[in-house]
From Swiss-Prot:
Belongs to the membrane fusion protein (MFP) (TC 8.A.1) family. Induction: Transcriptionally regulated by CusR in response to copper and silver ions. Residues 1-28 form the signal peptide. One of its GO terms (cellular component) is membrane. This is Cation efflux system protein CusB. The cus efflux system is composed of CusA, CusB, CusC and CusF. NCBIfam families: PRK09783.1, RND_mfp. GO terms for molecular function: copper ion binding; copper ion transmembrane transporter activity; transition metal ion binding. The keyword Signal applies. Part of a cation efflux system that mediates resistance to copper and silver. Gene3D superfamilies: 2.40.30.170, 2.40.420.20, 6.10.140.730.
Length: 407
């Protein structure tokens, strides 16, 4: 019994000593800071690809094969933007760019087409009824020089007018009367060379030759010997080949940049070795309703006739705008109804801002308004930040501010 009592007493004494030691240790250990031991409060979980859908616990996204991301209470945005865990932004490769001011450069190629110069276009008519005596061996597509004979014909009205002229000369008609007859012949279409021959020889001519009035290519010629011809019949159509026209359709949005022929570089795949000289250019006023383009017409030297109507060509436009605000095009978020960027403020917060886009070219976008020179915009890794801005309500605040400024 004494041994049992001794054992029990020893156990009780040991427990008291242990309890006392624990109490002393607990009192001696300094309290840890609450901020280091307290866990960050999670508001909800979400899939960055579908930020408007929230979940009450972690796991795999039902939409994508990726883990849900926590939304922490201390990430709630202030009125000026949102904060994001630096680890997340680093993992996503978030990059920024500075808003600059400078000219927006354009270097774009447009398909073009070679065509006849409509200013060098001649229609040959007899302008009086008659019949064809001879047609010279020509057809559509043949090249002719100015003065090349096309056909011989007899015009009874011209023969009659010549008879009147000679009769007045023989009977002492006045100069006014004879000149009136000659003018009538001119108006009726009698060639000037034949009128001079009449005056010189004082003999009636019964056969007349119609000749090409310009150098060019015959584009219409369908007459045969023995045919009757009315005064309004077209004998031939001839179109010049030097210069030719080269036309290209350019978007109406960049038409304002076209100022000078030095901006153009013209090439023809069929003649890559040929240097083309642009005499002048014209931007036609009409806009194609279907394509929203304007026709740019170039007048190009073609003395050697190497350029043929119907050939394909390429027009390179090299130009630059006046200085304006520029950002990388990849920094722009365009939803169709809204264009915005994500800026970075001095405190490192991401702030969405609505912008007005003017034009874009070669990966650079020019802005009308919305930013200032020197601001920082996110140019890579936009998706996560834009999702956070949507979740936190920063986008709604941006829209509200835009609506307030609009009023």
């Amino acid at each position: 019994m004494k041994k049992i009592a001794l054992i029990i007493g020893s156990m009780i004494a040991g427990g008291i000593i242990s309890a006392a030691g624990f109490t002393w240790v607990a009192k001696a250990e300094p309290p840890a800071e609450k901020t280091s031991t307290a866990e960050r409060k999670i508001l909800f979980w979400y899939d960055p690809m579908y930020p408007n859908t929230r979940f009450d616990k972690p796991g795999k996204s039902p939409f994508m094969d990726m883990d849900l991301v926590p939304k922490y209470a201390d990430e709630e945005s202030s009125a000026s933007g949102v904060r994001i865990d630096p680890t997340q932004t680093q993992n996503l490769g978030v990059k920024t760019a500075t808003v600059t001011r400078g000219p927006l450069t354009f270097a774009q190629s447009f398909p073009a087409n070679v065509s006849y110069n409509e200013y060098q276009y001649a229609i040959v008519q007899a302008r009086a009824a008659g019949f064809i005596d001879k047609v010279y061996p020509l057809t559509v597509g043949d090249k002719v020089q100015k003065g090349t004979p096309l056909l011989d014909l007899t015009i009874p009205d011209w023969v009659e007018a010549q008879s009147e002229y000679l009769l007045l000369r023989e009977t002492g008609g006045t100069a006014t009367q004879t000149e009136g007859i000659l003018e009538r012949l001119r108006l009726a279409g009698m060639p000037e060379a034949d009128i001079r021959r009449l005056i010189a020889t004082q003999k009636i001519q019964t056969r007349f030759t119609l000749k090409a009035p310009i150098d060019g290519v015959i584009t219409a010629f369908d007459l045969r010997a023995g045919m009757n011809i009315a005064k309004d019949n077209v004998v031939a159509k001839i179109q010049g080949m030097d210069p030719v026209w080269v036309t290209a359709a350019i978007p109406e949005s960049i038409a304002w940049l076209v100022k000078d022929a030095s901006q153009f570089t013209l090439t023809v795949p069929a003649r890559p070795d040929k240097t083309l000289t642009i005499r002048k250019w014209t931007l036609l006023p009409g806009v194609d309703a279907a394509t929203r383009t304007l026709q740019l017409r170039l007048e190009v030297d073609n003395a050697d006739e190497a350029l043929k109507p119907g050939m394909n060509a390429w027009l390179q436009l090299n130009t630059a705008s006046e200085p304006m605000l520029l950002i990388p095009s990849q920094a722009l978020i365009d939803t169709g109804s809204e264009q915005r960027v994500i800026t970075v403020d001095a405190d490192g917060r991401f702030v969405p801002k609505r912008v007005a886009v003017f034009q874009a070219s070669q990966g650079v976008t020019a802005l009308r308004s919305g930013l200032a020179e020197g601001e920082k915009v996110v140019s890579s890794g936009l998706f996560l930040i834009d999702s956070e801005a949507n979740i936190s309500g920063a986008l709604e605040r941006m829209r509200s501010e835009s609506a307030t400024h609009a009023h």
